[in-house]
Amino acid sequence: MSSLMATLPQVRLSADEISVDVVVYGGTSAGVAAAVQVSRLGHSVTLIEPGSHIGGLTSGGLGFTDSGDKRVIGGVAREFYQRIRRHYDQPSAWVQEKSSDYPRYRPGDDAMWTFEPKVAETVFHQMLKEANVKVLMRERLNRATGVRIAGGRVVSITMESGRIFSGKQFIDTTYEGDLMAAAGVKYTVGREANSVYGETLNGNQVKANVHNHRFLKNVDPWLTPGDPSSGLVAEVENAGPGEDGTGDHRVQAYCFRMCMSRVASNRVPFPKPDNYNERRYELLFRNFEAGDLRVPISPDMMPNGKTDTNNNCAFSTDYLGGNYLYPEASYEKRESIVRDHEDYQKGLMWTLANHPRVPEVVRQHMTQWGLPADEFVDNGNWPHQLYVREARRMVSDYVVTELDCRRTRIAEDSVGLGSYNMDSHNVRRYITADGFVQNEGDVQVSPGGAYLISYKSVIPARGQVTNLSVPVCLSSSHIAYGSIRMEPVFMILGQSTATAAVQAIRANKALQDLPYAALREQLVKDGQVLDLPPGLKKQELITKASLKGLVLDDSDAKLSGTWTSSTSSAKYVGTGYLHDGDVEKGQKSLRWELTAVATGDHELRLAYSSHSNRASNVPVTVSVNGSVSDLIINQKKQPSQDGLFCSLGTYNLKTDDKIVVTISNKDTDGYVVVDALQLLPSK
């Protein structure tokens, strides 16, 4: 492979052809970081952006950074946030409020992680200008015939305008992976089944939907309530819940990370779309009328009285099901999908502020907000970037999965770290067995700390093109991508792939043959963080399938009261465990129901993680065919079975005997923790 570059055909350049060392396609935050890094390493680079703005989501409304563990954000990414802080160090930056009134501005901090969209774009432009990066806007790849490949390498890419960009290396930093796909690189769309990569949080996820983003009240889905023959209201799929863990084509929902203002002098009322249709919001009205009075948005405050506004609750800014075709759609179809999302969200905001079927208390709350007059001034104060949370994902020789996020597998060729929750937004609304509406797809599980991202996951597999890297639509499962897909990580990977591209040029090697040691040395020199923070190490993954006997996880239990999921402890079954928060004593309980599958003596075991803050007097009730045993478990004490399970006793069972185990937090003197239940035949 190393001789391929030397044998590339020499092509004479026309007036419409630009030749550089590295072509970066996609002006996202990753694209900016990649282009800046190439130039700083002394090589020529062109950054091509299909739209009219650079920065992607970072300059498109996502100003409340999903940063995770900030210790693992280094290099160009950290420099960006340091520049943000320096901007807000200037008194002139504070126009609508005083810096002292904004709690997330702390002059002594190394960096600042919240910012206004226009400030982010300005900082990106400054970085590009200082690095002498040539930026070309409004140039879209000819996806049908625009990628020229020779000898297993991308030679040039042609835009719809006819302009040609040739290079020695190419980096696809789009959210959609258009260059990757057009170059014939293998990819996937949708959710894999858990069985594909040995995961627990992928695919269809009904049981995991225990957070805010669901219906808390019974809401009828039929046009005429109670009458299925009348048809469904808008935004509901005519299907049941499905089987957990099965894969499908669905994509987690998109929205606009809307910037709002409540400063009267800088506030524009929410516009009513010309094609407004109140029937799109029938579920919203019915949910309010059922008694759910939560304001269905999540506005996080940024400087100068503005927000980064995200989805929240049962029916909100996420447009479930409206994006399934987007990843592979034509440009024209994508534009239609974006307009549909814009109409949906603008209509939602106008509805919340104005419609008479919205409770007055909600309307009063919403009328204090509007769009900021000084943001997105060329787009009606509306964000120019749809939040494409996930589109195509490359399939390479290394696929980052839940195993990596949980550190049960640790990559040996790190080019950056992730640390945010494995976070999938809902993908659809279905009809429950009881005939009501519910959301599906929401998963929010902490990986329990930072994890390493493999170099092999940002380059194509061997046998595919040898000079294209993909730091955004990288090789990852759906649920792992839910953690990786944060803007700081995209910048980190953009810098790392740019460094690899430069080293491949200098060494005259394919990206797949690049020595990792040299790459690592340069990345560390340039401030990248490549190792786990102190105290983090490889974890043990314990699944139900890996344990003997009949095992029920906490997700299999019936809950009373509000329990909190956690992964803070080092050892647990499945995706985590539950705890009572050491609050609301006597108001929380958990109940498992199981049936014996064999006759004979069986030991019943309870899994929990011990700690000094745990309760010493957890009440557990075991009922076998109505015969009740009351137990007290000291969870300060480490479980005797593998440090994970404690015995709840041995019981003589017959096939089909009914067993009920109930755990309560009544009168407990610390945290009550519940992980799993195991029924084992006695030896």
List each model region and its residues.
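N-terminal Rossmann-like FAD-binding beta1-loop-alpha1 element of flavoenzymes
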Residues: V22-H43
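Ligand-binding pocket scaffold of soluble enzyme catalytic domains
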Residues: V20, A30, S59, R140-N142, ...
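Flavin (FAD/FMN)-binding glycine-rich loop and adjacent Rossmann-like elements that form
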Residues: E121, V155, R163-Q169, T173-K544
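Extracellular/periplasmic catalytic domains that process cell-envelope and extracellular macromolecules
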Residues: D16-E17, S39-L41, A150, G247-V251, ...
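Extracytoplasmic
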Residues: L541-K683
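Conserved N-terminal/central alpha/beta ligand/cofactor-binding core
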Residues: H43-S44, E49-G146, T188, V196-G198, ...
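Extreme N-terminal leader/targeting segments of oxidoreductases
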Residues: M1-V22, L41, M137
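Conserved beta-strand-loop-beta-strand element in the redox core of flavoprotein oxidoreductases
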Residues: G146-I164
